[in-house]
From Swiss-Prot:
This is Solute carrier family 35 member F1. It is found in: Cytoplasmic vesicle, Secretory vesicle, Synaptic vesicle membrane. One of its GO terms (molecular function) is transmembrane transporter activity. One of its GO terms (cellular component) is synaptic vesicle membrane. It comes from Mus musculus. It holds the Pfam family SLC35F. The gene is Slc35f1. Belongs to the SLC35F solute transporter family. The chain crosses the membrane at residues 60-80, 94-114, 129-147, 159-179, 186-206, 221-241, 247-267, 284-304, 311-331, 335-355. InterPro entries: SLC35_F1/F2/F6, SLC35F_Transporter. Putative solute transporter.
Length: 408
């Protein structure tokens, strides 16, 4: 008898393949008991040092320093003007501007005249003469209105209302240059203006000379008009030096600025010029003023191209403080600790503003990084997908390609 075969084991169907796991699991090593506090504190200190080093990088510090060079030049302009007006009774703001425009004409306009091709002076005039004519007139009248305002209103009013140039530059940059700001930029701007307010408060407390203030409304309107024209001029300058060239801007400003200031000098200031008691001291002051003004005009496009018109105007807020510190020795001003507080508050605001980059909006979904002091810009290929530097968890298959985004 043949024994029955043992029952064959039933074959189980293979299990279905597991669905793809799109959840990224991160395992962190926990510190050993007893050493956690030391590890965490050391890690937090290292992280804080890295953040500070990232903010206070070389590019940002250079940008702030360049802005302070401009501020020192403005301080030199103010000091020489004060000596001319108060010690020698030479109230000649148009003549002083005329000297600067003549220097720009001799250096930069003649450079354009000897160039060949499309960058020649005549070629530029054929294409854009009316734009530079308007810009030259705006630049001249901006200088004239602010200087003229000192005859009607107080020093405090001029200092406060001159800050109006900052919102003008921001709005014009937003609409015409398409520059987009982050929250930290607005925080930095507010801190800078608070520092300026602290300086004005110190002026009032120590009783610093405020001027006659005979017709404050007229003076205040002159300051607001001058600040508005300054803002238009600065934003237009930024547009020109980014799309064309610094030499073209300065050459055309020298040409039309000298033309219009010469006409205004002949009409409005020729009698004042004849009253000036000329001697070597007055001549030296005019030379010093012209050197500072020429240096400011020549160097400002370099700083604007590296940073922005907004950053430059924030940097110039410290010019009054430099003038005041010089006045402690030259004019025996009274000192207040609020001046130092104001100075460092403005510098903190500048560091905050310069700590991150602004953007130029070229498309609602695509932003191109603007060259600002936080660091060098690296151009990425347009075909490569850029992943933002954040940690995220994907819970499903992506079915649509995301737009390319530059993340600061």
């Amino acid at each position: 008898m043949i024994p029955p075969e043992p029952p064959q084991p039933q074959l189980q169907p293979p299990p279905p393949p597991a669905p793809p796991n799109h959840v990224v699991t991160t395992i962190e090593n926990l510190p050993a008991e007893g050493s956690g506090g030391v590890s965490l504190s050391a890690s937090s200190r290292a992280s804080m040092r890295q953040r500070i080093r990232k903010v206070l990088n070389r590019e940002m510090l250079i940008s702030v320093a360049l802005g302070q060079v401009l501020s020192l030049l403005v301080c030199g302009i103010g000091l020489t003007s004060k000596y001319l007006a108060e010690d020698f009774h030479a109230n000649t703001p148009v003549f002083q501007s005329f000297l600067n425009y003549i220097l720009l004409f001799l250096v930069y306009t003649t450079t354009l005249a000897v160039r060949q091709g499309e960058e020649n002076l005549l070629a530029i005039l054929r294409r854009r003469w009316w734009k530079y004519m308007i810009l030259g007139l705006i630049d001249l009248e901006a200088n004239y209105l602010v200087v003229k305002a000192y005859q009607y209103t107080t020093l405090t009013s001029v200092q406060l209302l001159d800050c109006f140039v900052i919102p003008v530059v921001i709005l014009l940059s937003w609409f015409f240059l398409l520059i987009r700001y982050k929250a930290v930029h607005f925080i930095g701007i507010v801190v800078c203006i608070l520092g300026m307010g602290c300086m004005v408060g110190a002026d009032v407390l120590v009783g610093r000379h405020q001027g006659a203030g005979e017709n404050k409304l007229v003076g205040d309107l002159l300051v607001l008009g001058g600040a508005t024209l300054y803002g238009i001029s600065n934003v237009w300058e930024e547009s020109i030096i980014r799309t064309l060239s610094r030499v073209e801007f300065l050459g055309m400003i020298g040409l039309f600025g000298a033309f219009f200031s010469g006409i205004q000098l002949a009409i409005m200031e020729h009698k004042e010029l004849l009253k000036v008691p000329w001697d070597w001291q007055i001549g030296l002051l005019y030379v010093g003023f012209s050197a500072c003004m020429f240096g400011l005009y020549s160097f400002m496009p370099v700083v604007i191209k590296k940073t922005s018109a907004t950053s430059v105007n924030l940097s110039l807020l410290t010019a009054d403080l430099y003038s005041l510190f010089c006045g402690l020795f030259l004019f025996h001003y009274k000192f207040s600790g609020l001046y130092l507080l104001s100075f460092f508050t403005i510098l903190i605001g500048l560091v905050l503003y310069s700590s991150t980059s602004t953007y130029i909006a070229q498309d609602p979904r695509v932003y191109k990084q603007f060259r600002n002091p936080s660091g060098p810009v690296v151009d990425l290929p347009s075909t490569a997908q850029v992943e933002p530097s954040v940690t995220y968890t994907s819970l499903g298959q992506e079915t649509e390609e995301e737009p390319h985004v530059r993340v600061a």
